[in-house]
Amino acid sequence: MVKIEDLQRITMLKGFPDHLFEILAREAQLNIYGVNTQLITIHERVDTFFMLIMGQVAVKKELTPRVDIIFDYIQSGSSFGTSALMEGSTASYTAVCQETCEAITLSGKRIRELFKENHELAYYMLLGAARQYKNKMDIRAGMIMKALDENPELKKDIHDIEDLTHVI
């Protein structure tokens, strides 16, 4: 169980009705992770949805065998692991703690069960996830194009440019 006040600090949950915060507060856990803890691994199943209360998490993906791109540094108030909201989804990135992190977590399996029981909760959670996804995709597509424009030699090593942008 977590405090409703902590949940209200999460950007994706802005505008949530109070009664939905109560449901999430009962189901969520508070966890602390150390530096370099890998929370999500690319191409592996995502079973946990994370809402960062404190710390910083790097979201990265291999561009070439020698170069990783860090797409984002997730800060307090942000969420990640949205794939956990959909059954059978795998990660399209790796997420690693850059410092000690405190995160509210929700079991993907449990939140999907709650979605079936409470369609209003499903609506608000997935609406927040969709908004977050669009914002991130707009930013990341621009970052990729800028990196490739500044480093044209990398273009020959990239086989699927679309695959690079499919990171949430």
Predicted regions and their residues:
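Phosphate-/nucleic-acid-contacting segments
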Residues: 147-168
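Local beta-strand/beta-hairpin segments that build beta-sheet-rich folds
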Residues: 39, 70-71
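Regulatory nucleotide-sensing modules
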Residues: 8-60
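A short beta-strand-loop-beta hairpin characteristic of the jelly-roll/cupin
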Residues: 57-69
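Short solvent-exposed loop/turn micro-motifs enriched in small/polar/acidic residues
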Residues: 24, 42-44, 64, 77, ...
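A small-molecule sensor/coupling module
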Residues: 21, 91, 110-151
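Cyclic-nucleotide recognition modules
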Residues: 9, 71-127
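Short, contiguous pre-domain boundary segments
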Residues: 4-6
